[in-house]
Amino acid sequence: MKEGSPLTISALPQVEYRQGTVVKHDGYEIIDHWFQVPLTHGLIFSKGRDAALSSRFADQSIKIFAREVINTSETLTLPVEKRPYIVYLQGGPGFGSPKTGSIGGWIAELAKTHRVILLDQRGTGMSSPLSARNITAVGDPQIQAEYVELFRADSIIADAEAIREVLLASRKDKRWSTIGQ
């Protein structure tokens, strides 16, 4: 979006979901998940719903990528459909989640008891990037600052909550655990 005045809309864009590639490899099922989430929904946590709806970016959404790792070994005592979810939040600065080419270490251990979600937080990995090109394309420095503000922790948590609601929609218990570094 180029320079312009803030707008007010009645509702943020809806969260959209698409399951991507499913790969079975070495006793694991790896599922790619793609989401479109409102660019401004994190503002609800920090500044309130009115701020999210009146932002100049309120009508925009961004892509969020998450990869699910499921241990499919039949020797595990808890069936896949009963395993709780755990989402991994990569610390910073600005890196995507670990790759799953060779699963080992903490991911392998957690996958014995959980469905592990590796979240590429907004601006990182395979999610919509936060790059110099994207930032300068939105307008003058004031508008750029407003845009970058939408990639803070409150927005990452709003994204994680939207993902949780989609992935756990059919479950009675909609809780999940988080882990990060």
Predicted regions and their residues:
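Short beta-strand immediately N-terminal to the catalytic nucleophile in serine-hydrolase-like folds
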Residues: 178-180
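Catalytic-loop region of hydrolases
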Residues: 1-123, 133-134, 176
